[in-house]
Amino acid sequence: FWARMATFAAIGLGGGAGRLLGGYIADRMGGTFLTMAAMGLSAVCALIVGFFYGGAPLLTFALCFIWGVAVVADSAQFSASITELAPKDRIGTMLTIQTSMGFLLTLTTIHLMPLAVDAFGWRYAFMALAIGPVLGVVAMARLRAHPDSLRLANGRR
């Protein structure tokens, strides 16, 4: 029972908090800043969460809650970037592709994680989940450095 409640809290409540906090930060500091910070935090959580396996449940929950906040905080920024940077006649198609790719990546990850756990154990399997956020930080940094990024969020990038 408690494991299910903790999962709901980390994903449902943490995710909700992440969306609100992410929007607030993005409005004030810019979407690329928020996205890089959220993905960086998500990568750190992925790198260390496996080492909490079998340890203190409250510490594990706290880390997973933080991860739940971070993992969704950037989601809206991708859609916002598309709507602000894409040619107007392609926005719908690009949003559809972006959303579909997100679901495909999530589905693939969910199915590959048991194989990673079997091969490497809980402590190390989660480390693979840091790859995506690290690459995302690099991609967002490149976007932030591009002149077109000034078209994002009224110039706040």
Where do the protein language model's features map onto the residues?
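Residue-level signature of mid-helix packing/kink "hotspots" within the transmembrane helices
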Residues: 12-20, 106-107
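Helix-to-loop junctions at the C-terminal end of transmembrane segments
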Residues: 19-30, 117
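Loop-to-transmembrane helix entry
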Residues: 1-13
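Multi-pass alpha-helical transporter architecture, strongest
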Residues: 50, 122, 128-157
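A late C-terminal transmembrane helix in Major Facilitator Superfamily
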Residues: 84-119
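C-terminal transmembrane helical hairpin of 12-TM major facilitator-type secondary transporters
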Residues: 29-81
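Residue-level hotspots within transmembrane alpha-helices of multi-pass secondary transporters
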Residues: 20-24, 111, 138
